[in-house]
């Protein structure tokens, strides 16, 4: 079975073909236009998707060495995401499915991220046979949930203000780094001292001693942004430039340590021995290393997607559609689908 996946939820235009559960093409076109603005401009993102969608889909089909008529299913992100951006991909998928007389499967973007760790050409380890804890962490989302084998979810924690990826990008902007700042901070931090300055870890046992906070799996990163801004304002530009790698490492440690701490604590509280980490921030080298070390200490299995599947991509959309079809969790015949506003667990 050949499934075409389409992803346009933010600033990546992507199309992929999954054949019998294995990725055989995955084309991603990142929109560089947003760098000049220090963040994604929704209207520009939608226009870029409109400009790129045909060529990206054609490239994915050609790389798969098939014809469009060989496709069995069309799958597309139906949200959450930037509404205009989502609608470009979803409407294109609707039209393509209708023209080819193929079924259409709408896919939840967050759900696809959760299962991106199990894309077959990426992971040697099989998916866990029992429930697992999922940390989904990106520029727009930071969420912990329990994933059941019937593809149902229980959200146990989420950000109450800013997402972790946004914290990376906004603090990077304060430091004068290019957008997206996450990968730049990751590179700088390799040369820096993560203990150079202790930035706050909100909603953790380090910030409060009461049991309610130790059992709280929500996240908060707005205070970190304020702390970084205050730190920068009390030092001259020469000092900041001289210690840029140390500051980057300290910011990164403040973000990743909270993600690791809460994810491990959730697994321990609920007696679950498997964790998956996905989303754009899962590409961060410090997060991957720290989470692996913590899981090894606790005897927990860790599943993280390869770097290409960490950020937004259509392979995860097609793979999620394939999984839902295999488990009878979707009816792929509705051309009149509306975008999802959120992830419900």
From Swiss-Prot:
Positions of Fe cation binding: 109, 113, 312
Described function: Required for the formation of a threonylcarbamoyl group on adenosine at position 37 (t(6)A37) in tRNAs that read codons beginning with adenine. Is involved in the transfer of the threonylcarbamoyl moiety of threonylcarbamoyl-AMP (TC-AMP) to the N6 group of A37, together with TsaE and TsaB. TsaD likely plays a direct catalytic role in this reaction.
Keyword Metal-binding present in the record's keywords: the answer is: yes
Q: Which Pfam families match?
A: TsaD
Catalysed reactions, as listed in the record: L-threonylcarbamoyladenylate + adenosine(37) in tRNA = N(6)-L-threonylcarbamoyladenosine(37) in tRNA + AMP + H(+)
Which InterPro entries does the protein's record reference? Answer: ATPase_NBD (IPR043129), Gcp-like_dom (IPR000905), KAE1/TsaD (IPR017861), TsaD (IPR022450)
Q: Which family does the similarity line name?
A: Belongs to the KAE1 / TsaD family.
The record's Gene3D superfamilies line, in alphabetical order, gives: 3.30.420.40
Protein known as = tRNA N6-adenosine threonylcarbamoyltransferase
- Gene name as annotated: tsaD
Instruction: Name the principal localization, coarsely classed.
Output: cytoplasm
UniProt source species = Prosthecochloris aestuarii (strain DSM 271 / SK 413)
Q: What are its E.C. numbers?
A: 2.3.1.234
